[in-house]
Amino acid sequence: MSVPDYMQCAEDHQTLLVVVQPVGIVSEENFFRIYKRICSVSQISVRDSQRVLYIRYRHHYPPENNEWGDFQTHRKVVGLITITDCFSAKDWPQTFEKFHVQKEIYGSTLYDSRLFVFGLQGEIVEQPRTDVAFYPNYEDCQTVEKRIEDFIESLFIVLESKRLDRATDKSGDKIPLLCVPFEKKDFVGLDTDSRHYKKRCQGRMRKHVGDLCLQAGMLQDSLVHYHMSVELLRSVNDFLWLGAALEGLCSASVIYHYPGGTGGKSGARRFQGSTLPAEAANRHRPGAQEVLIDPGALTTNGINPDTSTEIGRAKNCLSPEDIIDKYKEAISYYSKYKNAGVIELEACIKAVRVLAIQKRSMEASEFLQNAVYINLRQLSEEEKIQRYSILSELYELIGFHRKSAFFKRVAAMQCVAPSIAEPGWRACYKLLLETLPGYSLSLDPKDFSRGTHRGWAAVQMRLLHELVYASRRMGNPALSVRHLSFLLQTMLDFLSDQEKKDVAQSLENYTSKCPGTMEPIALPGGLTLPPVPFTKLPIVRHVKLLNLPASLRPHKMKSLLGQNVSTKSPFIYSPIIAHNRGEERNKKIDFQWVQGDVCEVQLMVYNPMPFELRVENMGLLTSGVEFESLPAALSLPAESGLYPVTLVGVPQTTGTITVNGYHTTVFGVFSDCLLDNLPGIKTSGSTVEVIPALPRLQISTSLPRSAHSLQPSSGDEISTNVSVQLYNGESQQLIIKLENIGMEPLEKLEVTSKVLTTKEKLYGDFLSWKLEETLAQFPLQPGKVATFTINIKVKLDFSCQENLLQDLSDDGISVSGFPLSSPFRQVVRPRVEGKPVNPPESNKAGDYSHVKTLEAVLNFKYSGGPGHTEGYYRNLSLGLHVEVEPSVFFTRVSTLPATSTRQCHLLLDVFNSTEHELTVSTRSSEALILHAGECQRMAIQVDKFNFESFPESPGEKGQFANPKQLEEERREARGLEIHSKLGICWRIPSLKRSGEASVEGLLNQLVLEHLQLAPLQWDVLVDGQPCDREAVAACQVGDPVRLEVRLTNRSPRSVGPFALTVVPFQDHQNGVHNYDLHDTVSFVGSSTFYLDAVQPSGQSACLGALLFLYTGDFFLHIRFHEDSTSKELPPSWFCLPSVHVCALEAQA
């Protein structure tokens, strides 16, 4: 044997060994799910008997250990259970072949085997098999345990038959000689007929039968066979097998005396399969120790498993003292054989477990000392770790704590030996933790603050350093920080100046990746590492609470959120001064803090380190009321004297507040330090009264802070200034987060804005918001955030630069494009009298006169809580600085009629004034690409607008009495409507920015008239089909063509009557129109149509007919008769569509 089982105990001799292995590719999760269920069937009662069969499961077992199965039958693999995945019938033959290959590995010793197949369905599943079990999946397999019980019963049948065969051999029969692997060559050529040889054969067979009886649950019979074997083997000096017989006798006696087993707590393997360690159970490699089943427990009915009576058992069974003596004798026989080292080691371990139950520690230590010196060939690193770990556990089991710690540490160092390709730092760390009690080392810093130091500081520091290094290498920097913090806090007095520097530097390196906290760290084994506060870094000697500054007082007003209240309150805070000042820490101080305001505490500290100490995140720890600590940072010189430090915070509720201590971050480690735990501290009191206060509002925006500080004329202080740079027409949302960082709900909020820039003409709303959505979230509870969105939309008038474009036109530059290196800067160059030939360089570069600036102030007045009742409010002002650059603007606007009377073409000359290529698009046209400084014309076909349907504006209701203002307002309203319908947008792909291009300031009266939908809507129908746009009506020569003219009156007054004349003509496409068509076109009836008066929103129609005598293309021109009625209306009201009729040859 080459692989020892360090978890062996005496009761394992009565178990049957069953190997459970996967076949093919099976996930570890699925395998161990079934493996645990199989392990749950650890013992069964034999039918019609009081005997109990115990099973020991392995998911890996070295085949070379199986060769020792004749020497000790509990080492023989008698059962094989394989688990496999098979999802198709074509894979089944190969899977079954793999099962047979797996059986061949242990084939010489197997009693029976089973194959569990998951995933296969179909005809193969329906075929009855005893050695194969099919399951559709890993969830639907309820009969696994039942099949395992049947499998164990089949093992028992074979076991019982073998026991009976061996036990009933006649003395005259030839008994085979059982051998261990290394003996086979030694018996070649021996006289098999000699008496010595026969006794050897009989003695070994008796021992073998004893093993079988013990496994079959016949304890009394096994004792008898072991005694007979010992006598036979002792007579022939067969020492190896004599030792095995003695060990078997000891095992049977231990099972009798200690039915609860000898594994104890250290033998976690003895519990059910649910106790599988995560790391050990998930490895398939030689030498991996497995969790075993409890073979020493009685049956559930409490019946003794032995079929024999209790009579005579005491005579064959060894006493507890004799058990140990026989173990010593057996081990002494094993030691004679070099190849029996594993057997000797396991026997020592079994004896130690028995002695631990008997509480004979000194004798147990002798066995362990012997085990230490047993030579087991060249062990692998993993086997060394196992060996040292088990030695440590066994020493711990017998109460030798320091020696246990020694071997644990040796095992830990072996886990990370240089010869290991993948060092096991996690196992190393776990083992190092278990050595701490042996070195009188606790991981609770409170244990080092009471009394004198216990243990050897040098050894403890060495062990702490090893813990730090192991935790770092296993990828858990939080553990490294905690252990290093503990070392620095508890061992500071034992560290030299250089060691202090080294430890501090290491700690900073670790905390740069993982800061230290005050949270307990839970380790996988159930151990919890308590926090380590740095009460010595720095040392605090004096604490003093300070009064509030006057600048934090709220504003008082006569009417809450009134319009005429000054932002500077005349109220002067003057607390009542108490004259009974005391030095006691619990004395209340003679001033008050205000709820929600920043409060200050002064500490006098000094640095014990030989270098500059940087303390970050230093704040207060309080009780009595809710308190928000605002941390500070400081730097203390090396070994400094008393150094003043001011800590601030905000009380969140009213009442009495007590300053209990402070928290710090030193070397990246966060610490909570209580004043009661600081020796020699002085204070003038740490308790103060907190009066009710207002909520506190904190504003944060989505825009960057501005370097421009606005100075409103009202003298209000701007809390925050933000800036944004936009192109003209561009919109951006300013998202403001209103966070209530106070203690009271925010109940009232008023938002106002004031534009400080008045010289620029603004179109539309510069700043707009909807406060209702924000107020719907009120009252805003403490700690809550409300989002307030302000829309910033800049639409300025840059049309003044049209005059500058005219300068370029005067120079002969084409309006379709400007071939200039920097066209924009030349465009925006101010007009001067007499243009110079060579303008100075200063005018070419650095001229930013085209940028326009808008400035506004947003005021937030809010109140709530007790301050709201008392008439206080707070005021926050937000300054907004917007720089607007021109994007695109229109240099010329004109219109052209369209083919439809309800539409027209809007012609726009668009100029790109940016330095980037951009695209201009509308809702109905494709994008137009404009290079920097380029001007192009774009035509937009638009539906005409019904301006008369616009709702009345406030100006038309009498707010503006000036007719000029009324007309201006109407024009702006129409321009806004046209702008919204056109939807002209620009986009700069390189900057991913976009905006709107406005024509509001460029629409003159003529353009507006062309864009307006005529109040009289005329429709012409030929044979019932509308004629509009470019539609052509077809007819046949000689057939009358019905012509209908409809009028819809959308004006607010009655119109008509009207007389219309239809004039046909032909267009020769050369500018010549032929109206002489008397012989070609004939009217059925009159060529003049009459329409009666039409009321508002009414309709009227007139009918007529034409007869085309020849084929050809004809056009119908409808003329109005000039009379008093038609002259009163604008010409634009009489826009009839042209009619195009194609006369075709009549079909035969």
UniProtKB/Swiss-Prot annotation:
Keyword annotations: Cytoplasm, Differentiation, Endoplasmic reticulum, Golgi apparatus, Intellectual disability, Phosphoprotein
Keyword Manganese: no
Compartment annotation: Golgi apparatus, cis-Golgi network; Endoplasmic reticulum; Cytoplasm
Tissue specificity field: Expressed at high levels in muscle and kidney and to a lower extent in brain, heart and placenta.
Source taxon at top rank: Eukaryota
Modified residue annotations for Phosphoserine: S566, S953
Coiled coil segments of this chain: none
InterPro entries listed in its UniProt record: TRAPP_II_complex_Trs120
Record bears the keyword Cell inner membrane: no
One BP annotation, GO: vesicle tethering
GO cellular component, one term: trans-Golgi network
Family: Belongs to the NIBP family.
Chain's role: Functions as an activator of NF-kappa-B through increased phosphorylation of the IKK complex. May function in neuronal cells differentiation. May play a role in vesicular transport from endoplasmic reticulum to Golgi.
Subunit structure and binding partners: Component of the multisubunit TRAPP (transport protein particle) complex, which includes at least TRAPPC2, TRAPPC2L, TRAPPC3, TRAPPC3L, TRAPPC4, TRAPPC5, TRAPPC8, TRAPPC9, TRAPPC10, TRAPPC11 and TRAPPC12. Directly interacts with IKBKB and MAP3K14.
Disease linkage: Intellectual developmental disorder, autosomal recessive 13: A disorder characterized by significantly below average general intellectual functioning associated with impairments in adaptive behavior and manifested during the developmental period. Brain magnetic resonance imaging of MRT13 patients indicates the presence of mild cerebral white matter hypoplasia. Microcephaly is present in some but not all affected individuals.
The name this protein goes by in its record: Trafficking protein particle complex subunit 9
Organism, scientific name: Homo sapiens
Phylogenetic lineage: Eukaryota, Metazoa, Chordata, Craniata, Vertebrata
Gene for this chain: TRAPPC9
